[in-house]
Amino acid sequence: MFLIFIIIISLSGPAHGQSAEFHGSATVQFLETMQHSQHIKLIQPLHFTDSGGDTWTTEANQVIPLNLLTDEIRLTRPLPSPFEYLKTMILFHGQVEGGRSDWRRTQAIIYEALIAEGMQEHWAKMIYAAVRAEGWRWEPLESSCFAMCHASSPSLRWRPLPDYEQLRHTLDWILVEFPSLPEIDERVEALITHTGPHIFGQ
């Protein structure tokens, strides 16, 4: 079975007075095949400028999964639909697939990307916390570690394993207490039980 349809999503300027913003329009092709169930293909490049002035680009023709969070979170907490933060999802997975940026910096811009996309702050902080806890991490392709140890591999990426009960409590805490991002980072760091298989890229 093969299903494709195309949608164009307008990307607005800064939201809520933030300097971070998406540029242009996102044109994506929805895929439903045996190989790529619930995936999208980016037809045109997507650009995002963060609050520090750096521009992040997701190149055209990348095939991207239509989710940012695992079922452990999506099915147990009433978070916004992925379609409400589609551009942020494209941004993050584009960096994962590209494998050239630092995963720490990529995760750090998720919150401001969500805000730039129009997400309410409490939802943005909850999604940000989940990405910090269980989101993809990777060794950059151009790093010395990759060149010395993993040159024969097309990529090296992994997900950390959080204590999901504590993560769900943390999402509830964010909704009630509205903590700062540093407070969220500290709490999330404490609930990760396994950072991953890679000795250098934790």
Task: Tell me what each language-model feature is.
Residues 12-14:
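N-terminal signal peptide c-region/cleavage motif recognized by signal peptidases
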Residues 17-202:
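Extended terminal accessory/targeting regions
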Residues 2-10:
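Bacterial N-terminal signal peptides
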